[in-house]
Design a protein with these regions (language model features):
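Extended, small/polar residue-biased N-terminal targeting/export presequences
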Residues: 26-122, 351
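Short, charged beta->alpha transition segments
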Residues: 109-116, 138-142, 223-226
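Short, solvent-exposed loop/turn elements at domain surfaces
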Residues: 24-31, 68, 132-135, 302-303
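"Short basic amphipathic alpha-helical interaction patches in structured regions
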Residues: 33, 138-142, 168-170
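C-terminal "post-core" interaction segments
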Residues: 8-17, 120-124, 128-131, 144-151, ...
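Sequence signature of WD/YWTD-type beta-propeller architectures
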Residues: 2-9, 19-21, 33-34
Length: 374
């Protein structure tokens, strides 16, 4: 007896698996209002896996979400450790903005992380992507090279994001404590709320499920990690950004600005950031034959602001405090250096030397929320 599945049956199973996965993981329930109508819409038309994928793409497009898609290129895929994790917040990262202090060869892609210390003790740190497992270790090594600086330029131009967890962990090099970000996921019992924190000893995240039959709050186990040394805490900081600064890198900016010491954080850029307050997770179906990226969560700044979804429904981007029109790389870097020198001079004039003791308790005065572009 032949028990092998027909091409049509395999195609139907594949299409249905995609429909089911998106239906239980996609964050915005309002866009799933008519999702049930897609379950059997193409049953009579699907005759193999190729046609199943073609119709699945049409189904996914109905969500009007640029980031929920079937992944074609294997190099863009990051396998999640579990359905509740968010290992990859974004798609393939864009190339970093170039800078005159970079040491990349012209025919090579920019390195993900580099740092330099000028003779006048200005530290420069470029992070072009958070989309790799070892990014925190790379940043740690780069930070160590500029730990003796008097002020820092953090270059996040062109950084389209990557792994949210790693981006939040990197905040520990600049901050001593505080709420870093809040994420909201769909959950079978309601909404799962995840928050990232720093304290003197730990980098940790908490998970709570809100809702369910009792409309109560269920606290899940807290994940604790040894924090990274705050080698740059308290030092004047200028952050470089542009229109391609997005998602996890925007999370980092919000955390650094809203937890930073007032008068010691400044943003310079050629335009407002992308305004990508959403995160994606990647999934494999049919033993890796199909790879999907699904918008899984919304994230919020420490102050509660949502940056939007890159303008699909909203775009509430981060505005630079100092605008540099037509920046090609060197222009904004020069302005950033000038702004940093102004802060250093102001601190010297006021006799403020608190940055000499990284890891010491912060003052009570923190920076205002980043300017949001509506």
């Amino acid at each position: 007896m032949n028990i092998s599945k027909t091409a049509s049956t395999q195609g139907l199973e594949l299409y249905h698996a995609i429909w089911e996965l998106v239906g239980v993981t996609f964050f915005d329930k309002s866009r799933l209002a008519n999702w049930s109508s897609w379950e059997h819409k193409f049953d009579e038309l699907i005759d193999n896996e190729e046609s199943a994928l073609r119709y699945a793409d049409e189904m996914l497009a109905s969500l009007n979400d640029t980031y929920t898609e079937r992944l074609i290129a294997p190099s863009t895929f990051v396998s999640p450790s579990s359905a509740d994790d968010l290992p990859a917040a974004d798609g393939k990262s864009a190339d970093a903005a170039t800078s005159p202090t970079a040491v990349d060869k012209p025919d090579e892609k920019p390195t993900d992380v580099m740092s330099a210390l000028t003779p006048s003790k200005i530290g420069y740190l470029r992070i072009s992507s958070f989309d790799r497992e070892d990014i925190v270790e790379l940043v740690e090594a780069a930070v160590a090279k500029i730990a003796n600086c008097e002020g820092v330029i953090l270059d996040l131009r062109g950084n389209s994001g990557g792994r949210m967890h790693q981006a939040m962990e990197c905040c520990g090099f600049f901050l001593d404590q505080g709420l870093l970000a809040t994420l909201k996921f769909r959950h079978e019992e309601g909404v799962k709320i995840r928050q990232y924190f720093l304290n003197e000893d730990q980098f940790f995240l908490t998970d709570e499920v809100h809702g369910g039959s009792s409309n109560g709050i269920t606290k899940l186990p807290t994940d604790l990690y040894k924090r990274r040394a705050p080698l740059l805490f308290g030092k004047p900081l200028v952050i470089l950004l542009n229109r391609r600064t997005a998602s996890a890198s925007e999370m980092m900016i919000c955390a650094l600005v809203q937890n930073g010491i007032a008068g010691r954080v400044h943003m310079v850029g050629s335009a407002a950031t992308a305004g990508k307050g959403i995160g994606q997770a990647d999934y494999e179906l049919f033993e890796g034959k199909v790879k999907l990226r699904v918008t899984r969560c919304h994230w919020f700044a420490p102050g509660g602001e949502w940056l939007g979804d890159c303008g699909q429904t909203e775009r509430n981007a981060i505005e630079p405090e100092t605008l540099v029109d037509g920046d090609t790389g060197p222009e904004a870097l020069k302005v950033a250096a000038d702004e940093l020198r102004k802060m250093l001079c102001a601190n010297e004039a006021s006799g403020d030397t608190s940055s000499d003791a990284p890891g010491s308790a912060p003052t009570d005065s923190h920076s205002a929320a980043p300017a949001i572009a509506n």
